UniProtKB/Swiss-Prot annotation:
It comes from the Eukaryota. It is found in: Mitochondrion. The keyword Transcription does not apply. Belongs to the universal ribosomal protein uS10 family. GO terms for molecular function: structural constituent of ribosome. GO terms for biological process: translation. GO terms for cellular component: mitochondrion; small ribosomal subunit. Residues 1-64 form a transit peptide. PANTHER family: 30S RIBOSOMAL PROTEIN S10 FAMILY MEMBER (PTHR11700). This is Small ribosomal subunit protein uS10m. Component of the mitochondrial small ribosomal subunit (mt-SSU). Mature N.crassa 74S mitochondrial ribosomes consist of a small (37S) and a large (54S) subunit. The 37S small subunit contains a 16S ribosomal RNA (16S mt-rRNA) and 32 different proteins. The 54S large subunit contains a 23S rRNA (23S mt-rRNA) and 42 different proteins. Keywords: Mitochondrion, Ribonucleoprotein, Ribosomal protein, Transit peptide. InterPro entries: Ribosomal_uS10 (IPR001848), Ribosomal_uS10_dom (IPR027486), Ribosomal_uS10_dom_sf (IPR036838).
Length: 268
């Protein structure tokens, strides 16, 4: 409907009224007002053009400042509730996530050196942590674990036999080591600690312990006195060294062999 008067005007047939109405459609829109007015009343339209933008921004940002002030006042009023964090786990379970506790050595005299070896770093660190916790609960001052130099072993072997014997392959094995030292420990407590680690040994872990015991002067006399006690204990053990306990002398040995031959052959 709008295109037809425009085409007629181009041909000189359309009246002027239609031209004016068509031109009024394409007139530009009035300029929009960019400043908003906050006041209300009959003079609002006159003041709207003079209202600055900065004044509007301050009025809109005022609630944000009030919220920040309220949050700061609430944080200042209750500082202790935010700092204190209560754990719901038992202490025995929470201790697994913390470093193992340690005892302090009074004199610093070494009593045991425990060396742990493994091919897996994960198993080694786990068992070192277990050994340190066990030493703490036994009252032993433990130090470590100290990383020792690695032991690297390599082998070159034929890959196969027959026609493939010229092709070779290399193998490498790395042994990781850690050292835990016990100071100022009682010999019986150290033996109890080592026995506990042997009882609850972890797979893939090798242990080697060097234990020092301090005794009084005149150790040879104490060893001579204990010799007689050891002999009495061994008298009952010597009987178990032979598989036949009732064999008394050499004279009955021939009779014993004859009876065994008859028994094995079935009386033939």
């Amino acid at each position: 409907m709008i295109i037809r008067p425009v085409v007629r005007s181009l041909q000189g047939r359309a009246p002027l009224a239609t031209l004016r109405s068509a031109q009024s459609v394409f007139q530009p829109l009035p300029q929009l007002r960019r400043n908003a007015s906050v006041t209300t009343g009959p003079d609002a339209a006159s003041k709207a053009s003079t209202t600055p933008i900065a004044r509007i921004t301050t009025t809109t940002e005022a609630p944000k400042d009030q919220k920040k002030a309220k949050a700061a006042a609430a944080a200042a009023a209750e500082p202790e509730e935010q700092e204190v964090i209560m754990s719901r786990m038992p202490r025995s379970l929470e201790a697994l996530y913390l470093q193992p506790l340690r005892r302090e050595a009074e004199y610093g005299v070494p009593s045991c050196d425990l060396q742990l070896r493994s091919y897996s770093i994960r198993n080694l660190e786990f068992f070192c942590d277990f050994a340190l916790r066990a030493a703490y609960y036994l009252g032993l001052p433990a130090f470590g674990p100290v990383p020792l130099p690695r032991m690297i072993e390599r082998w070159t072997v034929p890959k196969s036999h027959f026609i493939f014997k010229k092709s070779q392959e290399n193998f490498e094995r790395v042994t990781l080591r850690r050292l835990i030292q016990i100071k100022d420990g009682h010999p019986e407590t150290v033996q109890l600690w080592l026995a506990f680690l042997q009882k609850h040994a972890y797979y893939g872990i090798g242990m080697k312990a060097n234990v020092w015991e301090f005794s009084k002067l005149g150790v040879s006399k104490a060893m001579d006195e204990s010799k007689s006690e050891v002999e009495k204990l061994l008298e009952t053990r010597w009987e178990h060294l032979s598989h036949v306990s009732d064999m008394k002398g050499v004279g009955n040995f021939e009779d014993f062999l004859a009876k065994e031959r008859l028994r094995i052959s079935g009386g033939r």
